[in-house]
Each structure stands twice: as structure tokens, then as C-alpha cells.
Regions:
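N-terminal helix-turn-helix DNA-binding module of bacterial transcription factors
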Residues: 1-26
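Alpha-helical recognition/docking segments in bacterial nutrient-uptake
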Residues: 19-135, 139, 197-202
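Hinge/beta->alpha junction and helix N-cap segments in small-molecule ligand-binding domains
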Residues: 32-42, 60-69, 94-95, 112, ...
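Generic beta-sheet signal
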Residues: 88, 110, 148, 236-238, ...
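Short acidic capping loops at alpha-helix termini that bridge into adjacent secondary structure
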Residues: 144-145, 174-177, 228-235
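Flexible loop/turn connectors
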Residues: 195-297
Length: 297
């Protein structure tokens, strides 16, 4: 709807954008796929705080991983004269964001982004983080490592799987590559782990859960199966959350710089408000937080 209208009334949109900049609404739109997911909840809090620190108001919209809701949210934000948008997109319709960024208001993507796009984004080095995590498992003697992935359409998931595959291949373990699952959810982690541990005679050495929520499902399934992470099977997670510190055992995980990501997103957006030609594409380093869930084999 936005793209079609942009093409049909391009001159009107450009005129409105000029009026918007003059009007100075001092409002920023934030679009996230979920606020029940701890990662996005934390990211939203950082972005809102940083926007308010700059004397602006923030409108937070939730797309529920729906492209239809995403387009509706963008339309609503444009109708409310936001000066810029920070979004974690769902789906593959980059033209939607390109049109808004070009004709209506600056857009900065956060966490998720589009490859070969001239739209600014702030994300993590997802491939590097997964590469480091898998190498860590391999260096601890693990050879049969199962990767529980999320939605294959998400760039963050694809990059993490790419890092896992690269580490396995460079170690000569390409025949042991095993990628299962289809969402960054507790349910997915639980279901896939139940399938993995169903045959006790062929347990893998380790599970690499590609999100914090997936790791929660893994832990639940292991507990129900009377298996202990770090003893019967090793576990490492991508994503950090303070609750992992209080689990028994404490989960080894790849931490993203969520605070830095949110602050950078706001900084880049305001740079684009001042200079619409600015494009910044940044991938932040991750780090491994060591717990007790990885055994030495």
C-alpha cells in the first residue's frame, strides 16, 4: 500500500516530507517484531531511552512477524508525521523500506537488515559470533554438534548458520553438520531437543541453540529427559539474558551488544535526519560468556 501510493503520488509524498522536516514533529517511530521476546524488549527500552534523552518522543509499533502488520504499522507512523523510523523488519520486502527512506522519512534497520541494500542498519556480527561459538565447542573436543536454528528467512539466522557451517567445515567435520528447527521459540527448542535425545545411543556431543528462547526450550527438554547440560550433552546459546546466570548449570552463550546496538541506531538515525544522504551499515562484535554448560571431552 505504501509503495503503491508512493509511486502514484510521488510528488505529494516528497512535498509532505519537506513540510514534515519543517514542522519538526520531534517524534521517532520504532517498529519491532515482538516485545515479548527478551532481546527485542531490551532493545526497545534502550532505543526509547536514547530517543527521549535527545528530547524526542517515541512511538513503538509491534508487527508480530507479519508483513501485513508491518505495512500497516509503517502507514500509521507516516500518518503521525514521525521524523524517522528504526525498524527490525520481517519478511523480504526491502522496497517498502526503501520507498519510505527515500520519500518520507529516514529509516535505520536494527538487528535485521537487507543484503545489498543502501539502507542503514545496525546489527551484530552474527556469522562471527556463531563461528566463535562453534570453534569453542570443537576446541573442547566436540565433533557431533547439532545446530537448532530459527526462521530460515531471517538474515540473522542465516548468518549464524553460516558461521556454524564454516567452523564445522574448516575442522573437517562437514559430514557432521546437522541443522534442524524453524523458529527462535521455546517450543522449537523443546521439540527439536526431544527429537535429538530420543535415541540415547546416538546422542550428539553438543547442541548449539541459535537464540536465547530456543535455549530455554532445550533446557526444559533436557530436564524432562533426565539429562544435564555440561554433563550428558553440552549446550551453547546465541543471545544473552540475565536469567541464564541463574540456571543450573549456567549457560555458556554468545552475547550481543544490545545497549550499543540501540544507541548506535538512534545516533545513525539522527545523522540521517540532519543529512538524508548518509548511509551507515555497522555490525557489532559479539563475545562469549562462559558458563558451565560445555564439557571438556
Amino acid at each position: 500500500m505504501i509503495v503503491a501510493e508512493a509511486r502514484r503520488c510521488n510528488y505529494i509524498i516528497k512535498s509532505n516530507a519537506q513540510i514534515l522536516r519543517q514542522a519538526n514533529s520531534k517524534t521517532i517511530g520504532i517498529m519491532l517484531p515482538s516485545v515479548s521476546n527478551p532481546f527485542f524488549a531490551e532493545l526497545a527500552a534502550v532505543i526509547v531511552d536514547e530517543v527521549k534523552r535527545r528530547g524526542y518522543n517515541a512511538i513503538v509499533s509491534v508487527t508480530n512477524e507479519s508483513e501485513v502488520d508491518q505495512e500497516s504499522c509503517l502507514s500509521s507512523l507516516m500518518a503521525r508525521d514521525v521524523e524517522g523510523v528504526i525498524a527490525a523488519p520481517c519478511g523480504s520486502n526491502q522496497n517498502l523500506f526503501y520507498s519510505v527512506n527515500r520519500d518520507m522519512a529516514p529509516v535505520v534497520l536494527v538487528d535485521r537488515f537487507f543484503i545489498d541494500s543502501n539502507i542503514s542498519y545496525i546489527s551484530s556480527n552474527n556469522m562471527g559470533g556463531a563461528l566463535d561459538a562453534t570453534r569453542y565447542l570443537i576446541n573442547k573436543g566436540h565433533k557431533r554438534i547439532v545446530c537448532i536454528q530459527g526462521d530460515q528467512n531471517l538474515i540473522t539466522n542465516r548468518k549464524r548458520v553460516e558461521g556454524y557451517r564454516k567452523a564445522m567445515t574448516e575442522a573437517g567435520l562437514e559430514d557432521n553438520i546437522s541443522v534442524v528447527g524453524d523458529s527462535f521459540s521455546v517450543q522449537n527448542g523443546y521439540f527439536e531437543t526431544k527429537m535429538i535425545v530420543g535415541n540415547r545411543s546416538s546422542l550428539p556431543d553438543a547442541i548449539f541453540a541459535l537464540s536465547y528462547t530456543t535455549a530455554l526450550g532445550v533446557m526444559k527438554a533436557l530436564k524432562e529427559s533426565n539429562l544435564t547440560a555440561g554433563k550428558d550433552i553440552s549446550l551453547i546459546s546465541f543471545d544473552d539474558n540475565m536469567s541464564l546466570d541463574y540456571m543450573q548449570p549456567e549457560i555458556t552463550r554468545v552475547a550481543q551488544a544490545v545497549d550499543e546496538m540501540g544507541k548506535f541506531a538512534v545516533k545513525v538515525l539522527f545523522e540521517q535526519i540532519d543529512n538524508p544522504q548518509t548511509v551507515s551499515q555497522i555490525e557489532l562484535n559479539t563475545k562469549i560468556i562462559y558458563g558451565d554448560s560445555v564439557a571438556e571431552l
